[in-house]
């Protein structure tokens, strides 16, 4: 656990990406899933995997391959050629619950009396420790430390008393508390499920006579598929050759209770994705325009910290009239500092990830736009880099509000004491990162960013849609009582 004074431990961690596919013509899907995972690589860089099965072959035979590293590091052409099957699921992972090991890589494959299921999960369950203990008391033996295995066990258990695989998925999901976007393959069906709050994105696509369920629309574009629609919060969708797309909305909540993670629009998702009908790129442009209106400053250049700061920087430029320009060269072969599990890895990444174009900033007053400041390392280092390259002033603008509270739903913000904004004023943060001025996006602007969609902003406000646990997102219990302020809004 990072101590209170280690605000320079860098920013957040999220998350995972899922991609499932069923080809009704019987064509192999492993290679297409591979390209889909490539498009989702930004959602997780620790491990990845693919599991496929042949619906015309023996019921329950699943071929699975997974490993640590990036998609192109784990899979070789010979791996994909051996994976014969017309239905399958893939996953890219960052560990928000459970350690970063090959055993915890997904998809999970579970053999049980009704056959075999493969599961990929994005999110975090706040009641996973209790559910896990309940299963262990009934004889379950876990092979991983991740909450996703709890989901798989419950689906298998519920299948014994259900008429169908999709009913088992729905009944299992009704036990879960937290965030989840699931893709599950049964021997003859592709199933997707999204939690009732809609924390994590999930959508459906179609290519020729095949269907896809995946985290982001950019993955559909990559494989030449057509977007069909989003999976709705609380929905279980089932795809089969006999019935096409079926929908079960039993778990759906009233729309005003939905709680999409706003950080998908601010940072997590690729800018070329659309989530619940809203363009991620357009949202970031709006954020930049709002910053220019609410936190103006005289300057010569507006620039974004690649990649997620670029669109907001362009929006700031459009609204302010200050020229937009490129000030950073990014090393494309270094993963995001956001998605590095160890502090030593994060700091090394910051040092080699970016270089400043001296010709672009020397002698200029620079406005630097970034998506967030969580612990502070990246902002502090980049401000110094700009000054070393000759910038006369560095004004930092952040396209999100200050992070003040932990997240329990799949984003690694484990303790308030680790957050640079905890018990500090904006002026104090500005001094710590070495900027001439600092401005954050106002909390009231977030819903406008998401075009009025119901969103969740608990990491900024401390208001949760459900009672938070006395544990961090990696399952480590706190001894102290949870602050009253942290509790959900009534």
Q: Can you annotate each of these PLM segments?
A:
Residues 1-233, 238-299, 305, 393:
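Conserved short alpha-helical segments that host acidic/polar catalytic motifs at enzyme active sites
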Residues 96-97, 127, 191, 199-200, ...:
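Flexible loop/turn segments at secondary-structure boundaries
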Residues 140, 161-162, 296-300, 318-325, ...:
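Secondary-structure transition/capping motifs at alpha-helix termini
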Residues 144, 149-152, 324-335, 432-450:
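A conserved beta-strand->alpha-helix junction
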Residues 173, 188-189, 224-226, 230, ...:
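PRPP-dependent phosphoribosyltransferase catalytic core
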Residues 302, 309-316, 320, 324, ...:
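Extended, hydrophobic alpha-helical segments in both membrane/secreted and soluble proteins
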Residues 321-366, 376-377, 404-412:
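Short, glycine/charge-rich flexible loops or terminal/linker lids adjacent to PRPP-binding catalytic cores
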Residues 355-369, 373, 398, 474-481:
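Mobile, glycine- and charge-enriched loop segments
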């Amino acid at each position: 656990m990072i101590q209170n004074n280690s605000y320079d431990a860098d920013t957040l961690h999220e998350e995972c990406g899922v991609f499932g596919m069923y080809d009704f013509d019987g064509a192999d899907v492993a290679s297409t899933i591979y390209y889909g995972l490539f498009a989702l690589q930004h959602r997780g860089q620790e491990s990845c995997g693919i599991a496929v099965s042949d619906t015309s072959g023996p019921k329950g035979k699943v071929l699975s391959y997974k490993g640590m590293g990036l998609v192109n590091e784990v899979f070789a052409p010979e791996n994909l050629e051996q994976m014969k099957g017309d239905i399958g699921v893939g996953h890219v992972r960052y560990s928000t619950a459970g350690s970063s090991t090959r055993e915890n890589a997904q998809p999970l494959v579970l053999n049980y009396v009704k056959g075999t299921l493969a599961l990929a999960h994005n999110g975090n369950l706040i009641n996973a420790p209790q559910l896990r203990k309940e299963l262990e008391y009934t004889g379950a033996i876990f092979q991983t430390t991740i909450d996703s295995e709890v989901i798989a066990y419950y689906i298998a258990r519920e299948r014994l008393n259900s008429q169908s695989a999709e009913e088992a998925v729905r009944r299992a999901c009704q036990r879960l508390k937290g965030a989840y976007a699931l893709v599950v393959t049964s021997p003859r069906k592709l199933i997707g499920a999204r939690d009732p709050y809609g924390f994590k994105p999930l959508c459906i696509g179609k290519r020729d006579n095949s269907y896809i369920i995946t985290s982001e629309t950019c993955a559909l574009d990559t494989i030449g598929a057509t977007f069909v629609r989003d999976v709705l919060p609380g929905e279980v969708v089932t795809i089969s050759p006999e019935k096409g797309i079926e929908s079960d909305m039993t778990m759906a909540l009233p729309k005003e209770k939905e709680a999409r993670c706003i950080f998908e629009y601010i940072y997590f998702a690729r800018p070329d994705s659309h989530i619940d009908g809203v363009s991620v790129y357009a949202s970031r442009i709006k954020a930049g325009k709002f910053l220019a209106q609410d936190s103006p400053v005289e300057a010569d250049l507006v620039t974004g910290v690649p990649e997620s700061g670029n669109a907001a920087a362009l929006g700031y430029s459009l609204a302010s009239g200050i020229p937009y320009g490129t000030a950073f060269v990014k090393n494309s072969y270094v993963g995001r500092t956001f998605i590095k599990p160890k502090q030593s890895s994060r700091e090394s990444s910051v040092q080699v990830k970016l270089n400043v174009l001296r010709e672009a900033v020397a002698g200029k007053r620079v406005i630097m736009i970034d998506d967030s400041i969580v612990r502070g390392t990246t902002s502090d280092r980049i401000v110094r880099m700009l000054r070393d390259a000759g910038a006369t002033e560095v004004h930092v603008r952040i396209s999100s509000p200050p992070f003040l509270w932990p997240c329990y739903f799949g984003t690694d913000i484990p303790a308030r004491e680790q957050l640079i904004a905890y018990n500090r004023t904006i002026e104090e943060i500005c001094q710590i990162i070495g900027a001439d001025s600092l401005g954050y996006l106002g909390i009231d602007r977030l819903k406008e960013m998401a075009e009025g969609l119901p969103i969740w902003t608990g990491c900024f406000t401390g208001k949760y849609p459900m009672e938070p646990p006395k544990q961090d997102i990696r399952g480590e219990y706190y001894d102290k009582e949870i602050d009253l302020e942290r509790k959900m809004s009534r």
